Amino acid sequence: MKDCKPTYTPLQHNLKLTPVQPGETPIPEMTIDRKRVSYLTIIGSLMYAMLGTRLDLAFAVGLLSCFSAAPTSAHWEAAKRTLRYLQATKDMELVYDGSDVAIDMDFHGYSDADWSSDLDTSRSTSGYIFISNRAAISWASKRQSMVALSSTESEYIGLSITGQHIQWLRTFFDEIGQSQSGPTELNCNNQAAIILCKDPQFRARTKHIQWERQ
């Protein structure tokens, strides 16, 4: 796809993908650049890039991988768009700030979640990213294991998952001799979820929430 038309977003805005429907025929392989390529091969290649340096592919890879068992033409078109995005942005890189004499190894994080984005199960997707020295050091995008009844609940579950990863990161930094100088800053754009975190009392709208353990 060297000569493909460039695109600058991994997926189409508000893209909604569904599993193979009755009467549809799955397409496990397709010819790209005169080569037979399997859908699983494309997902594996995208995942390899995402786990290494391309955090911007996390959501797209998570979504596309849900249809690996029986991909249809719609899933292929979405996957090829992600490849076009990767081709257009292949010069992007992570750059860590090492200009200071004493490098600050403290990290901070961001947590976000949508609500009921899975058309088949009504489950939400949450994600997080952690920054140190002005670049990302850890990231993830994952479908939640339970159905959230509101956007606040979805964000709250996402914060729980992110909080568990903070604890793991702090332990890791301790082991390499880079203990954090204070509490880890975690940012979220849902005010109701923030209030719930600050005052986690049982309420009628939240007492049913179960914690996700990673």
Explain the meaning of each model-derived region.
Residues 1-214:
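Long, low-complexity, charge-biased intrinsically disordered regions
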